[in-house]
């Protein structure tokens, strides 16, 4: 982390300001290893690998840490050969491509493929994840002067309230213990009139019944992540020839998903890249401790309860996408 980014952080316990209390390794203006301390209470937070850590490295989201460190660059556009991350980021947020002078918060960064897209706007990006996937993000984006990567908990975010011009949260809400509560804390960190964009898996009773991942998740979500990942690779390898045949059928890729083989051929992926995405997202289907989708109406209710304005919500291939702006609710809540 850059020392000048210290002002973007606060103590996650008491909200006090932080100071650098120890430095073990520094590269120019970047702190690689050291410690932050609260000036109000006795809390201290290690800096490991250039990332301030406000939660233990290992936690209920460790499966995501394994996933995104093993596949650190798999879904980056320059690796996949398709602009999937760019299109999703700007398509869902509908934000301008020039955000210089603005402060943007990314909630749930994973490996950082959307961090990269956000950073290209010129805004200052504060990106955090609950898992140690932050290490993959830091390796890919931590060198950027306008990026701060943090490991933190959405329910105890170490940032000043009402400080961000924009917040986005992709692919994360459904994997928290309470998506409604996680959503509710986001507007508190927006400046008046600030922009919010989130997505969450779509819930329908029929869709849930048909999605075979929910049949096996009661077993797989309790497995050791390393063991599950090994099983997933063997399963995808075993099924790959059959999946290739099924893929030739009309919408055969959808049947492959039901057979627990993530198939992104509809995006135009091929060969080794397609198979790498299959390893990644098959594991992603089965590993999360929590998988709690929501309906469009439910997400709209969350927004209304939070006092958000200019609310727009829609179903997309990625689930429910909501865009909104902070109103009086963001000013009053704290």
What annotation goes with each model-predicted range?
Residues 201-218, 271-289:
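Short, glycine-/aromatic-enriched active-site segment of Class I SAM-dependent methyltransferases
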Residues 226-288:
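SAM-dependent methyltransferase
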Residues 1-158, 291-292, 298, 313-334:
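Conserved N-terminal segment of class I S-adenosyl-L-methionine
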Residues 167-168:
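Hydrophobic beta-strand segment of the Class I
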Residues 195-237:
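Conserved class I S-adenosyl-L-methionine
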């Amino acid at each position: 982390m850059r020392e000048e980014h210290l002002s973007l952080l606060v103590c996650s316990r008491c909200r006090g300001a932080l100071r650098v209390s120890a430095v073990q390794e520094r590269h120019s203006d970047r702190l690689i290893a050291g410690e932050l301390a609260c000036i109000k209470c006795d809390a201290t937070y290690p800096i490991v690998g250039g990332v301030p850590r406000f939660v233990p490295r290992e936690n209920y989201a460790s499966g995501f840490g394994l996933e995104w460190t093993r596949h650190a660059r798999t879904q980056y556009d320059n690796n996949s050969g398709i602009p999937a991350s760019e299109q999703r980021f700007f398509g869902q947020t509908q934000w301008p491509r020039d955000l210089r002078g603005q402060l943007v918060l990314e909630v749930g960064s994973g490996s950082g493929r959307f961090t990269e897209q956000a950073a290209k706007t010129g805004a200052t990006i504060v990106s955090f994840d609950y898992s140690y996937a932050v290490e993959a993000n830091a390796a890919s984006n931590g060198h950027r002067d306008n990026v701060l990567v943090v490991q933190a908990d959405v329910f105890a975010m170490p940032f000043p309230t009402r400080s961000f011009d924009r917040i986005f949260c992709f692919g994360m809400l459904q994997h928290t213990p309470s998506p409604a509560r996680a959503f509710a804390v986001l507007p508190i960190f927006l400046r008046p009139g600030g922009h919010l964009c989130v997505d969450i898996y779509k819930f329908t009773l029929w869709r849930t019944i048909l999605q075979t991942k929910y049949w096996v998740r009661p077993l797989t979500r309790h497995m050791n992540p390393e063991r599950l990942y090994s099983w997933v690779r063997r399963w995808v390898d075993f099924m790959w020839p059959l999946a290739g045949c099924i893929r030739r059928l009309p919408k055969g890729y959808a049947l492959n998903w039901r057979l627990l083989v993530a198939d992104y051929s509809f995006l135009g992926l091929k060969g080794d890249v397609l198979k790498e995405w299959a390893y990644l997202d098959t594991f992603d289907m089965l590993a999360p401790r929590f998988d709690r989708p929501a309906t469009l109406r439910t997400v709209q209710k969350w927004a209304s309860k939070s006092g958000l304005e200019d609310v727009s919500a829609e179903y997309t291939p990625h689930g429910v996408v909501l865009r909104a702006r902070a109103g009086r609710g963001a000013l009053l809540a704290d």
